[in-house]
A protein has these predicted regions:
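Hydrophobic alpha-helix immediately C-terminal to the catalytic Tyr-X-X-X-Lys motif of short-chain
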Residues: 42, 46-50, 54, 64, ...
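Alpha-helical segment proximal to the catalytic Tyr-Lys
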Residues: 8, 52-56, 117
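A glycine/serine/threonine-rich, flexible loop-to-helix segment
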Residues: 56, 67-93, 133-147
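Active-site helix of classical SDR
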Residues: 3, 39, 47
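C-terminal helical subdomain
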Residues: 63, 83-119, 124-128
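Residue(s) in the substrate-gating loop at a strand-loop-helix junction
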Residues: 23
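Active-site loop immediately N-terminal to the catalytic Tyr-X3-Lys motif
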Residues: 28-34, 56, 96, 114
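Active-site loop-to-helix junction immediately N-terminal to the catalytic Tyr of the SDR YXXXK motif
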Residues: 29-37, 49, 77, 137
Length: 147
């Protein structure tokens, strides 16, 4: 898809940047989850491979791996209770809360900008310290949000 839909436009523009959305789930085992983490791990490899293939065309390819980020899913699971989401997230994120979409967007904007002109093939964890904590707790987190 990249080769057909994206590459020609960026090539015609003389280069550019692609940012893929992966997830912290791509790097850790999580109870009761298989397909999502596997698909996100595959996208990490796609990011690295595209970075190698597109570098000569002045196209940078990176990815962001968000931690828990306030979204429709979390809103629905908690009936809109952001404070509850943050309480549950505190056990899994060093910064003690879920992220905001705008915080992830700031990293994406950086990666798409000229300020990231020497960055390619990298994955940025925008995860409030989740990945620094090591293994996820053995107690599943998603059911706690729905309680």
């Amino acid at each position: 898809m990249y080769k057909r839909q994206v590459h020609p436009h960026l090539l015609a523009a003389g280069g550019g940047a692609i940012v893929n959305f992966t997830s912290i789930s791509s790097r850790v085992a999580q109870t009761g989850r298989w397909l999502y983490p596997v698909s996100k791990a595959a996208l990490l490899q796609v990011t690295r491979s595209l970075a190698m293939d597109y570098a000569a065309d002045r196209i940078r390819v990176n990815s962001v791996s968000p931690g828990w980020t306030w979204s429709r899913v979390m809103d629905e699971l908690t009936q809109g209770d952001r404070a509850k989401t943050d309480r549950v997230a505190a056990d899994y994120h060093l910064l003690g809360r879920a992220g905001d979409p705008a915080e992830v967007a700031e990293v994406v904007a950086f990666l798409l900008s000229d300020h990231a002109s020497f960055v390619t093939g990298a994955d940025y964890a925008v995860d409030g310290g989740y990945s620094a904590m090591g293994p996820e707790q053995a107690r599943p987190a998603i059911p706690r949000l729905a309680q």
